[in-house]
């Protein structure tokens, strides 16, 4: 152990760590540990001067192992690995002790938090001694992409990829392209025709020699790993295709909330209560009529149907407010004598041109009636003297009055929800869903179109409710990410993965069943299991499960983990 | 019981000048910035809301538009340019038309052509009547302006003035009673003890003569102009109703004429200032002009101008014939101005505004009393 030269670097993270943990005490303590050549405390280790300090120490003091006591390794492990590499030693000679998320951010007691930081630093020093040099590897990248979903996001991504000269397989469940946008008439806030937007994209997709469109098709299975996927696709009733692709883009869209679930709105029971998509259809056909064939005079849009209500969906569906305002414009231009009300909770008019659109809709004398979150307007039959089909009763918040308004057509602004087959898709392509069923991105802000599965991207409303500009931007971002991988030609595979010692493997196949990434193959001939290193995420399930102890995780060897645990325990026992 | 919203009311109020109310999104900046807005009358936002939603009954019993003097600060602060000040002005016009039981006011506000035609008709009838009187029944001569053998005898004109005054007072009185009914009488939840009416009655003359709430506005000039106009008008009214003999005498009676000249300067100065302001649109409260605003100001300038002209023609130039002709023309302005504008149009506010100050204080007292009663009933019993 004494032959190691370890550097320990304690980050103050401004005051994030230092305000609770005594960082100087941690570095003073580390200095005395066996094998530690240098220990320092610094304001921001991740800053350029912080990294320079490490690099200089490695070179001048001939350090061969580095411990950084700072934030979570998810945050800055790549940063410090790079520093090690720059200094000329193997990047895996690094170990991080998380004294921010695990100490200063979660504890109030400065003394106890400092004690815990000392224990974690000790454990990291004990562990890093056993780190082994690991090398990254590269595999080939297949340039074809599988795009799931022929809506505006899928079409856009397919065009971006094919325009760059790369082949695309566009899989659409329906018998036509266009997705949900094909059901829309005009679009907010500029009142452009959705049909015009789509028609051009669909024509270009169909004409592109690089895009193969598979209608009435669904993905059956996906195997392999980034750069080397194999997809089984069912085409039509009984056709099948197998394609090799390097990347997968999931753009499967949303489905609308089922308005029947909110019973007292009477959708399905009251003839003139319709959903926003039904009104879209009327607008596209140019025939806006009540069920009785009368031209309606009073239109009421009820916002947040299924959205922003903990009983249904707590989230905002983002597009319904502007869509409802759009109806105001379309209705008043089709029927100049009509009256339009918007029964809303809050007006969400974010986005380019939307606040202005809201203002213009107000100027057209649309009546905005605010109802309280947690309440719902009530639809009741009209009286014999009324010139309307129904009355809507609502406690109007801005006036504080109980009011009723006449209505001929009630339009329920149904929100977006995850598709019924979202869970199947997620399972097929190994991505996760959040509590509402939306696919989870790699990072909500910094990596919005990648997923935790390398090579699988998401775009459009399958990720979360959003409008056309957001969907298109995501599709283009995903295409750019895919093209980036294609242009590099090779895929870098992390050096951390599990390995099977074939001499000790009994062929029980327990690991094959357990692996969440389908990264373990079973060779029937040799009766041994083998890890596909490019697919392995180093989660460690197989390592823990193997009854023969035949599997070891690189960078997570028993020796490394046990010495880390011993580090904590030794420190604790030294404290009595 | 739910109140029925009427989407047509916004359209109706457009005729009264409320063109921008639909833009309001209820941020409440207007009520926050208004120097007059205070509990329990937080305006103009809530009035804007009643109008947007077409809560006609609420609006009809709402005194808040009369509590507003239109200093314009709300319109200047409004982030949506919904012109709350002008909307309140429009609601005053609409309320005037609703207080009026004859429907004439509604006709005038909705059609300036009808108002103009009515003014011309009354003017012509007045002219014809005075000419007939002068030539046929009065026994005077066109060459005599005042004293023995005057074309229009003071006594006859005085009687005519009082008859006209009584008719106007009757119309206005009925409308004021309707205003009381809509705002206080109809509301069964308000209990106002008769003594309160007496106790607060002093508010009527106070607000009429000082317009002190207007003085609370950050800008003092509009208040000063308005006060000068009102005092000049009142002075002239008093002179004509009680001192017509002195005004119309052969000699200059400075005790009466001095006030007359002051009032004329006040009337002409302020109305020309207002006209110029409405043309230039520099001050917020002059930015929007309804047709009735123009008619009112033009009539005022006309009446004040012909009034001083007859005086000058007689007393300075001793031109009796010209003075008599201008006198008849003057009456052709006075009668429609008082007869039509006071009960049915813009000038009705001389009664409605002080009344609203008075009624609103009664309302406020009753509301406070009601809240106290509710609080007392809801309070836990002593152990």
Predicted regions and their residues:
Chain B
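Hydrophobic alpha-helical transmembrane segments of multi-pass small-molecule transporters/permeases
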Residues: 29, 33, 73, 77, ...
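Iron-sulfur-cluster electron-transfer modules
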Residues: 21, 38, 48-245, 249
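Flexible metal-binding regulatory segments at protein termini and peripheral loops
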Residues: 1-2, 92, 96, 383
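Hydrophobic cores of alpha-helical transmembrane segments in multi-pass integral membrane proteins
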Residues: 91, 117-132, 158-177, 225-245, ...
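Cytosolic juxtamembrane regulatory segments of multi-pass membrane proteins
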Residues: 194-209, 302, 361-383
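Ferredoxin-type iron-sulfur electron-transfer modules and their immediate structural context
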Residues: 1-65, 350, 358, 364-365, ...
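Secondary-structure capping and boundary motifs in well-ordered enzyme cores
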Residues: 23-26, 60-63, 67-70, 261-264, ...
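Membrane-interfacial loop-to-transmembrane-helix junctions in polytopic alpha-helical membrane proteins
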Residues: 14-20, 61, 153-156, 214-224, ...
